[in-house]
UniProtKB/Swiss-Prot annotation:
NCBIfam families reported in the protein's UniProt record: hisC (TIGR01141), PRK03321.1 (NF002878)
Quaternary state and interactors: Homodimer.
Keywords: Aminotransferase, Pyridoxal phosphate, Transferase
Protein name, per record: Aromatic amino acid aminotransferase
Recorded GO MF terms: aromatic-amino-acid transaminase activity; histidinol-phosphate transaminase activity; pyridoxal phosphate binding
Role of this protein: Aminotransferase that catalyzes the conversion of aromatic amino acids and 2-oxoglutarate into corresponding aromatic oxo acids and L-glutamate.
HAMAP family tied to this protein: HisC_aminotrans_2, Phe_aminotrans_2
GO biological process: L-histidine biosynthetic process
Parts forming coiled coils: none
Database matches in Pfam families: Aminotran_1_2
Annotated source species: Corynebacterium diphtheriae (strain ATCC 700971 / NCTC 13129 / Biotype gravis)
Cofactor(s) the record lists: pyridoxal 5'-phosphate
Residue numbers bearing the N6-(pyridoxal phosphate)lysine modification: K213
Presence of the UniProt keyword Endoplasmic reticulum in the record: no
Amino acid sequence: MIRKDLSQIPTYVPGKRNDHALKLSSNEVTHRPLPSAAQAMAEAAAGANRYPDMGVTELRGALSEHLGVPAEQIAVGCGSSALCQQLVQITCTPGDEVVFPWRSFEAYPIFVQVVGATPVAVPLTSDGFNDLDAMAAAITPKTKLVFVCNPNNPSGTVVRREAFLEFMAKVPADVVVALDEAYTEYVRDEDTIFATEILSEFPNLVGLRTFSKAFGLAGVRVGYAFGPHELIDALNKVALPFGVNAVGQAGALASLNNLDELMEHTEEVVAVRDRVADHIGAAHSQANFVWIPAESRSETPFEIAEKLAAHDVLVRAFPEGVRITVTNEEESDRLLAAWDASFA
């Protein structure tokens, strides 16, 4: 009854959780939603007997003002992950190819294989950057979509403007490029490319962002895409009806209306992430996490995670390294104490 190829598709594995431990495994913020957002969500929940606004009209209007992009060129989805999958759906059929960096967001190959397309994973450079030259070289006549993760999850590196423009010059006009900017609010590198800056230059470019990270709304699943009309219209065609719930819409809108307060929270992360990285021997990052490559330690990534878990700190281990969320000074001090107790 079930497609035989599904047995070959990996299941997405979330970060570990433990109510008694410090959870630094899923790149969540430590702050609860803003009081105004919490109130808006509570009011929306009281009307849960009604369907949400399927067009997400009010939130798209606010996003239009925030991004400087017409509302008609914005699609809102059940997290940016859903929009990643929708991008694969609108571009690919079985036998087509999708290029993406690796290691990167672990759901990319899952989304690709679900529609029967072929994942083409391009290794990062030795210092953890998207290898744009290699990604461009990996494009074939079968390629329909390219994901570029900026900042890259889990290495925390960014894509520089000049390098991205050179990359786009090599990409065929009929191949869609998705610039995944889930952690963009944490970026302080002035040379970083942002999709909003060049959207009008490329009819095959779409940007992806989320309310799950810096906005602190991971539990209500709201993300958004912005790009040319043709791509946004197609994304809306394959979207699950009423897929963005009313509670999430209300929380996202209230958060956008209090952006200054939210950005203060991101500054807490920026203020401590280099100190955390230097203490544990991780690379500096432009996101709310740091990355320890496997080759930089004598312990395996899974041994590192196990030792920290013994001190009630949960981190995310991959075969290629360990990713550790950075939140604020208090939790960072707790992390570093656990690190010293484990590895000093």
